[in-house]
UniProtKB/Swiss-Prot annotation:
Gene source species: Dictyostelium discoideum
A GO cellular component entry from the record: cytoplasm
Binding site for GTP: 253-260, 300-304, 375-378
Subcellular compartments: Mitochondrion
Name the record gives this protein: tRNA modification GTPase gtpbp3, mitochondrial
Keywords from the UniProt entry: GTP-binding, Mitochondrion, Nucleotide-binding, Transit peptide, tRNA processing
Stated family: Belongs to the TRAFAC class TrmE-Era-EngA-EngB-Septin-like GTPase superfamily. TrmE GTPase family.
Protein role: GTPase involved in the 5-carboxymethylaminomethyl modification (mnm(5)s(2)U34) of the wobble uridine base in mitochondrial tRNAs.
Amino acid sequence: MIKRLFCSINKNKIINEPPKLSIIKDTIYNLSSGVGKSGVAIIRVSGPQAETVIRKLIKKSDVDKNEEIKSRYATLSTFYNPKTNEQLDKGMFIWFPSPNSFTGEDVVEFHIHGGRAVIYETMEAIGLIEGTRPSEQGEFTKRAFENGKMDLTQVEGLSDLLDASTSFQKKIALKQMQGSISEFYLSLRKDLIRASAYMEAFIDFGDDAELDPEIVDQSRNRIISIRDKIQQHLNDGKRGERLRDGANIAIVGPPNAGKSSLINLLTNRKASIVSPIAGTTRDIVEVILDIDGYPVIIGDTAGLRNSTNDQIEIEGIEMAKDRFNNSDIKLFLFDSFNLFSQLNQNQNLNSSFNFNEEIKNLFNFIDNETIIIFNKSDLLKQFDNLKEWENLKLNLLDNIKKSNNLNSIQSIEISCNNNENIKDLLNLLKLNLKNLFEIQDKESPLLTRLRYKQHLSDCVESLDRYLYYCEHDVVLASEELRSAILSISEITHSVNIDDLLDIIFKDFCIGK
């Protein structure tokens, strides 16, 4: 009955063990250290012929034919071509017999000098041994997964660790590779399996006098708690995706406000063209930065203005608007000197400030994720009435808050010309990035991949249907519960019908 119900969830999805390779004929080898000249290079060999490779490349005097090779021991040896007997190099090898190795197979690592010729000739010599071949991309890790040394989330964590360019990325990837995400999802899966076991027992053995008639309600309450936990995990605000790909920061504002100068200053190189000619930046110029360990993609955009007939510039402005709206943090630059000069010329400074339509149109782009930057503060020193400038700033910020219904707004005054307050701006960015990446629930790992979110969303939908069917049809409710188990199991690729059977036999003593 139980097996029949499991198979009825989806004819194309039968819960089963992940495929494992019992016999792998090929022994694979490749360079595990970085490509190029180096002091030491490491060549990894994995598979049934790994021990043969050792004995073929060394002389009998180093390791006797009948002598057992010491495992996890660095053995100094001279390596030779097995066909020509020509010396290849003098180095070390470390032997990792199955199953206590990275791949779960017999593995040997040759530590040799990192010259190109040494690496090439050693690889060529290994390839002469029958049953060996160069590995495909990621094949060592694939074998580790297939042999149960890593689950899918740990494999992805290893991939993220290799790609990590900031300390925060490295920290999260390392935790994932060591099983933090696996533990979290396997714990949820275990709770779902236990609740499902109660439901299955009630359906199949409901007439048994020893079964508590409230078992369905107990299972339902347990599922509500699990569902809420998963939903809370889903509401992580895209922190995990930002961690892997980088937080998007857009620099926007009117032409010649100093956007390109700012990005050049932040990157310490000439990433954007700096010119007094309005409309110089047409495309979005993106630069990847590490700000206090947080990965950031910062983009310089076209100046926002209405008075242009240049079709290319108009398209660039539209791209700037789109980038601004889809950014995690927005830096909006005003040209302090130009802004104050216009008001000095056009109105009595003792009256209230009236902003023209062009400036007011810029207000629409500002929201809670925006930092308003008043650039070119060094040029304001030529004015005598700087108190009026302070009034102007307050008036401007107040207008923006009222126009966009904002409770508060972040602002700072800088000069890209003499680096005034640039450190303060960086500190403000660090604070915003910290809030952006902050993990609210310390027990809940970050959702670093879209597929996790999809499987969890499918799981929540199944649990919602389960809660509905609990009131109408317990058999259908049970099927939805098993569908939820399947969805969450696909994250780690750990799907096993025996887990459910073990719970049933353990908790309900069916055979007595």
